[in-house]
């Protein structure tokens, strides 16, 4: 980022990169396959099969419910990437749709604060296509790891992270997309303090109002309208999440660590107070009735509760953590808030030129159709692997 988006001088993080796993990279067996066009690595008993341009060494850097992530070197572009293996990607239709959605969204976007897809590995045999491998640009760590570490964070660090989240969100929202699952672990960082938003598997089009049954966003960062099952949610849901994330950065602990839906709502009302009748206007009658029967809570003073936080930061967070989404600050207005004056530069906060289309989701796709769509995305990166 040029001009207003330059990082503060002291923002390089000394130990941003987490310690690599203990398994020695030289111990990972590698075998060429399919006539030397592919290479198989055996990682913790997992077969990791990618195109032969991903030469050794390869290193496991993460593991999740979906599979395993390795850092690898693309010998053709001379770039280090993070390759995520999604094992048996088509076994569950909802998961397969998430994968397809993430691929299509990230290929549509091009922004410094949104993680980029560098490659989708084509299957060695089109007719046996079960695992999906996606290569992303490689980052050192994520905000969740930084918050939990003893890495010192200055006010300037936190301010710069907040600015970059909002800068990325401005672009995402301008593409007609809501992220819907912003949380510290979905914000990637490098040692230079560059921040990139990732994990668009739950993203939705902003004009869509049907409530999604597959909605599993992390409870702690969830806006009140989602906790109260409002189907008519807007870009304001992401702004609420940003407010929660920023306060977690400043306080080094989650702002609203609810155990369940009911506890989550209680925690946020204990801080921001019971909403007025006027602020309930966006809710359905059931939700209004539920709120009215709760014990009343008086709003706490943010400044007294968080005396170590800059007053201008408190003012911005209070505008983000506003119960009524119609009154919540927008991303554009948050970027222009006095707290971010030193970083804000409207000429360097681009928008997406073409809105993203979720048209592919309008049809009930079969497993085979989803395979074909992801296969085509892989061929866009690797046309020479057309079968």
Curated annotation (Swiss-Prot):
Activity regulation info: Activated by tyrosine and threonine phosphorylation.
GO molecular function: ATP binding; MAP kinase activity; protein serine kinase activity
Cofactor requirements of the protein: Mg(2+)
Annotated EC: 2.7.11.24
InterPro entries: Kinase-like_dom_sf, MAP_kinase, MAP_kinase_CS, Prot_kinase_dom, Protein_kinase_ATP_BS, Ser/Thr_kinase_AS
EC class (word): transferase
This protein's domain notes: The TXY motif contains the threonine and tyrosine residues whose phosphorylation activates the MAP kinases.
Phosphothreonine PTM positions: 213
Tissue expression notes: Roots and stems.
Origin superkingdom: Eukaryota
Modification(s) after translation: Dually phosphorylated on Thr-213 and Tyr-215, which activates the enzyme. Autophosphorylated.
Chain positions recorded as ATP binding sites: 61-69, 84
Domain Protein kinase intervals: 55-340
Active site feature: 181 (proton acceptor)
Motif TXY: where in chain: 213-215
Name this protein carries in UniProt: Mitogen-activated protein kinase homolog MMK1
